[in-house]
């Protein structure tokens, strides 16, 4: 299954680039930075379902 390396996160500011990822919460995150910030906030409970929109 797909994984994303979030070891460099959280970051205070995310770039605006659009490369969507689908989280295990069925939410589409606009890019890796936004997704990884959410992963850190969830204490690791949020995982990547797949690349692309949910």
UniProtKB/Swiss-Prot annotation:
Keywords: Disulfide bond, Protease inhibitor, Repeat, Secreted, Serine protease inhibitor
Chain ranges of the Kazal-like domain: 4-54
Site (Reactive bond 3): 16-17
Protein name: Ovomucoid
SMART domains: KAZAL
Cysteines paired by S-S bonds: 6-36, 14-33, 22-54
Lineage: Eukaryota, Metazoa, Chordata, Craniata, Vertebrata
Principal subcellular localisation of the protein: secreted
Organism whose genome encodes this protein: Struthio camelus
GO molecular function annotations of the record: serine-type endopeptidase inhibitor activity
Subcellular location field: Secreted
């Amino acid at each position: 299954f797909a994984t994303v390396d979030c070891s460099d996160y959280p970051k205070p500011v995310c770039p605006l680039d659009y490369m969507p990822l689908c989280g295990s919460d069925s939410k589409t995150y606009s890019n890796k930075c936004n997704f990884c910030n959410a992963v850190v906030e969830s204490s690791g409970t949020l995982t990547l379902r797949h690349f692309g929109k949910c």
